[in-house]
Amino acid sequence: MQERYQPNSVEAAAQQTWQARDAYLVHEHAKNPDGSEKPKFYACSMLPYPSGKLHMGHVRNYTINDMMARQLRMRGYNVLMPMGWDAFGMPAENAAIKSKVPPAKWTYDNIAYMKKQMKAMGLAIDWSREMCACDPKYYKWNQWLFLKMLEKGIAYRKTQVVNWDPVDQTVLANEQVIDGRGWRSGAPVEKREIPGYYLRITDYAEELLDQVSTNLPGWPERVRLMQENWIGKSEGLRFAFPHRIAGADGKLIQDGKLYVFTTRADTIMGVTFCAVAPEHPLATHAAQSNPALAAFVEQCKLGGTTEAEMATREKEGMPTGLTVTHPLTGAEIDVWVGNYVLMTYGDGAVMGVPAHDERDFAFARKYGLPIRQVVALEGKTYSTDAWQEWYGDKQAGRTVNSGKYDGLAYQAAVDTIAADLAAQGLGEKQTTWRLRDWGISRQRYWGTPIPIIHCADCGPVPVPEQDLPVVLPDDLIPDGSGNPLAKNEAFLSCSCPRCGKPARRETDTMDTFVDSSWYFMRYTSPDNDQAMVDARNDYWMPMDQYIGGIEHAVLHLLYARFWTKVMRDLSLLNFDEPFTKLLCQGMVLNHIYSRKTPQGGIEYFWPEEVDNVYDAKGAIVGAKLQRDGSEVNYGGVGTMSKSKNNGVDPQSLIDTLGADTARLFVMFASPPEQTLEWSDSGVEGANRFLRRLWALGYAQREAVGRGLATGADWAQAPAPVKELRREVYGLLKQADYDYQRIQYNTVVSACMKMLNAIDDAPLPEGPAADAARAETLGLLLRVLYPVVPHITWHLWQDLGYAEHLGDLLDAPWPHVDEAALVADEIELMLQVNGKLRGSIRVAAKAPKEDIERIAAAQEEVARFLEGRPPKRVIVVPGKLVNVVG
């Protein structure tokens, strides 16, 4: 055994052995030595995008997964920990444009490097199950399921107003529009009408919502709430404002009814205007004879179509000159075009009740529209001068200024008004959803080709199943001017499957969220080229533990749940939800340093480029550049980011201090679900602990060897040996509990205390001490192994544990020796007249009379009683003894 800890050689030796053994190859229905079947456990991290290099967020995510997998394997589970690559998407195209290489080459080069990094981390991944989204063997099944959805009517084609990114030249989902700009390009998003394919996720809205509360108890509450809010169930009233507005053909537009939906039917008597979306038929009709309105409509189309953007955008409108009729009062109501109204939500029109809706209130004040109060609260005075929160209260209010509906509470008003509108054929109660069907068409090259052929005679025709996959050409180099598939004749040209005439392939590709909606099931059946999944999927799924960032709380998780339900309804699987438990690990943070450039931009500096300036309390208040002493701004801590120069390269850390140091730091520094603040001193502390562990093993190697060979009779062991065993087994019990709670930082803390206890124990020489050293160090190595597998495996081998107990890879999780936790002696607090004056040690099973005698005989008692005899002695078993005198 080498004297000094050398992480590079230690880790290389361990990894070579594991690879030679196929140590992490997993099979279904694995058996115990007695022939019984092991329970399965499927633990999976969200698959990464192959961007080029791992970042510390990856290291944290995968180490959490790896700790879980290794510890559960020790507990006797058949554990699956797979890995794959979310390989399609725009970054590969953008990189290809920049480097003038095909996205495929860029992607596979990155995968090779990142896979090498993962192996260097020592992750217990079954690489035989590796999948890659850009592999035709994988995306064939995207296409196959899409065709099945077409057959069932779940997938369909329609033209709709969409978010268009003019730089990336593609449609964006609502969630991909951030503050009116594309999530990748940063370009202002436009509205366009484009045909595309959609999936009816709204058909599953009720089930998706209901099962959030009934089927996902193992998910964080905040994620469940985010899912519920995104699905967004609203119960209200859909009703019409009649009108006599005719189009150019002389027919009434939309049959003479302007429909709106409201959850506040109790305020209908307060409607003073209606607003329609810029794309609404009434807006189009009015704009034909109104150039100013036409210009306003075009201006509105420059923004995105997301609810979030609508909420923050300044509300603007223009009157159409059209009016509709209030269905209950017969009053004429002006129709406006509003830039905040979405054509894709409801009927593309809203009623305006300024008195009781904050948005409408601001709009009415801006344009001088009437404000009519129709709900009042006792003791409150209404004023149109400024909005007050109670104006929107629907629980405590009563209707006023509403004619026959005066004096009604919210539900009574809703029911009465709904009944009256229904009697006129102008309204009905309805449930609506915030959730919208999933548009999966993307005008990009690097994605799953949509398996459709366009024929001049037959229209869109599905590609026959036997012709799948429609293979994406992998040698194209995008130039930034639209979709290169649309220019590639070899891909485009084909024959119609129905009539045989020349036809053209669909050039849109699928949203990359399709790829990540079921990849975790392909891990279970990776080598089946005849079926999407097989019986092995029934064995592993649903997944026991999913691990990933909170940023995926809505989109990815919702789409994966939807995809699972579709596959269930196609009889491909027999469960409702894909993920039993979800852990959202916290972000990794680091210090941010910056200053403004002369051009008005922001320049960021690496933490190692600056010296911090501290205040009297030791807090960072600024920084100076090391190279010239100039001042830079300290921006606190934030998520590690390439753009802010505050990331830490895991590979550099692995190369210098080892993967075990990186793993130990990210597990010890913070609970898994909380943010982790990077600390160079913390990293050094982790490395120092590992050096201490190695030094302890080296110093005790001979004693451990003797102890493993001889063993001991613990009942006859000296008191220091019993005390060491009691302390270590107590820490083992705590670590065992914390492993089950996934509180890995306190697991590491327990291991550090174990090391201190073993290192500091004043053991006498002899067989019992040798056996105690061997036992307690062996316990520490096993508890610590899931955290730092390389050093613990190496020490296990070098110290002889493998020879006596088998390879650490296959070692069982240690059981707590309850007998060791029973103390021969216990310590009791000693009080004199109720005040703490010291402590005494007594036999654990000492009778009350002996404890009273020992306590009364203490020097402290005589001193504080000033020679007086005790009047009485009170014993609180196991805690204290109080001498009263």
UniProtKB/Swiss-Prot annotation:
Residues annotated as transmembrane: none
Single annotated GO MF: ATP binding
Motif ('KMSKS' region): 639-643
Compartments reported by the entry: Cytoplasm
Organism: Bordetella parapertussis (strain 12822 / ATCC BAA-587 / NCTC 13253)
Superkingdom field: Bacteria
Binding site for ATP: K642
Family as reported in the entry's similarity comment: Belongs to the class-I aminoacyl-tRNA synthetase family.
Catalytic activity: tRNA(Leu) + L-leucine + ATP = L-leucyl-tRNA(Leu) + AMP + diphosphate
Protein name, entry field: Leucine--tRNA ligase
Family annotation (SUPFAM superfamilies): Anticodon-binding domain of a subclass of class I aminoacyl-tRNA synthetases (SSF47323), Nucleotidylyl transferase (SSF52374), ValRS/IleRS/LeuRS editing domain (SSF50677)
